[in-house]
Amino acid sequence: MSTGGGAVSDDMLEAAIGARARSLQSEIRWRVLIGHNLPEDAFAAYRDNAPHGVVVERSRPDFRQLLANCRLSISQGGYNTVMEVLAARTPAVCIPYAGGLESEQTLRCRLLAAGGAMEIVEQGSVDAAHVAAAVDRALSAGPAPVSGLDLGG
C-alpha cells in the first residue's frame, strides 16, 4: 500500500491496515509506504501500532521495483501511481481521496475500474471490510488488462 505524499491518507491507512486480517491474504506480509507529508508523530503511531505482518515505512526510492514485484497495490489513485500500476500490470485497489473539491482521483479510478483495470472503494465505503473484499476481488481477477486502455496520454 502506498499513500503518495500521505497528508490526507488516514482513512485509507486505517481501513487498509485493518483489511489484512479480513482478507484471504492475511497470512502474507503487507508493506505500507507512507509519504513524507504525514507528520512524523502520526507516521510513528502507524509504524509502532502496526499489527504483526504489517511493515510500515516511509516512501522509498525503489517504489517502482517494489510495485513490479508485489502481489497487489492499494493507493489513492494518484496519476503517477496509477500509471506505474498499469505499467507493472499489478492488481490494484484504489481508495480515492475525495475531500474538498477533489474529484480527479475518483474519476480516474472509476473509469479504470469500469474497464476492469482495478477495484475501487468509494469514499462512503472506506472501512476494513470493504477494502478486504476489494483486495480479494482484485487478486482473483489477476493482472490488469492493458489492451483496450489508451496509455498514450
Regions found by a protein language model. Name each.
Residues 24, 86, 113-114:
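Anion (oxyanion) recognition and catalysis
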Residues 58, 94, 120-122:
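Structural signal for conserved beta-strand scaffold positions within catalytic alpha/beta enzyme cores
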Residues 133, 137-153:
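C-terminal amphipathic helix plus adjacent low-complexity
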Residues 1-72, 106, 124-125:
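Donor-nucleotide binding loops and adjacent catalytic segments primarily
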Residues 61-105:
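A donor-sugar binding/catalytic signature common to diverse glycosyltransferases
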